């Protein structure tokens, strides 16, 4: 990945996906005013994200999540967030990868991400960092990374939230043998 691209690419990705979903922001605002009439529209806009094409980005999965409980965060020990089960509103989950490639060491690299777009979006965006050497994609909920925090996660407050793995998979430091992987992590 080019040195300057990652910090700008994730917000661009979120806005591009939002624009590609038939003006998610405008429709989300309308959905807040008339939730019963627009629930199907939000689900359709989510499904439409499968068709969005961006250079060097592979959309791997798009899923609509109905209102209800979300599983406990399996990465809470690494992120410091509460592992409590959450009651979330309807939202769209997009998983993908930015600039997939084979590294100098023959391993697969690329910045995997998860983006969650709430049906009732507040027009704000939160980038959720991974910490340490990354290597995993935490659920993009925007949980408060303080043990014992009772504050609601950003997604429950209407934020679009994205998380990513720092450009490599695994919690070890073997990726450090690949110079581009080191740079990707540094700029993530």
Regions found by a protein language model. Give the residues of each.
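Catalytic-loop region of hydrolases
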Residues: 30-124, 137, 148
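Bacterial N-terminal signal peptides
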Residues: 10-24
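Cap/lid segment of the alpha/beta-hydrolase catalytic domain
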Residues: 122, 130-188
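N-terminal secretory signal peptides that target proteins for export/translocation
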Residues: 1-8
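Signal peptide processing junction and immediate N-terminal pro/mature segment
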Residues: 20-34
């Amino acid at each position: 990945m080019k040195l300057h691209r990652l910090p700008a690419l994730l917000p661009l990705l979120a806005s591009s996906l939002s624009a590609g979903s038939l003006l998610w922001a405008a429709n989300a605002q309308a959905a807040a005013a008339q939730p019963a009439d627009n629930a199907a529209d939000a689900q359709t806009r989510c499904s439409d994200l499968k068709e969005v094409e961006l250079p060097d980005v592979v959309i791997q999965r798009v899923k609509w999540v109905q209102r209800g409980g979300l599983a406990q965060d399996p990465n809470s020990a690494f992120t410091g967030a509460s592992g409590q089960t959450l009651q979330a509103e309807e939202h769209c989950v997009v998983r993908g990868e930015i600039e997939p490639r084979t590294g100098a060491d023959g391993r697969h690299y690329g910045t995997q991400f998860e983006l969650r777009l709430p049906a009732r979006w507040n027009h704000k965006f939160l980038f959720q960092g991974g910490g340490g050497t990354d290597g995993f994609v935490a659920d993009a909920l925007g949980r408060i990374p303080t043990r014992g925090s009772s504050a609601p996660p950003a997604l429950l407050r209407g934020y679009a939230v994205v998380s990513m793995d720092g450009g490599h998979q695994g919690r070890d430091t073997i990726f450090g043998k690949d110079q581009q992987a080191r740079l990707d992590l540094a700029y993530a």
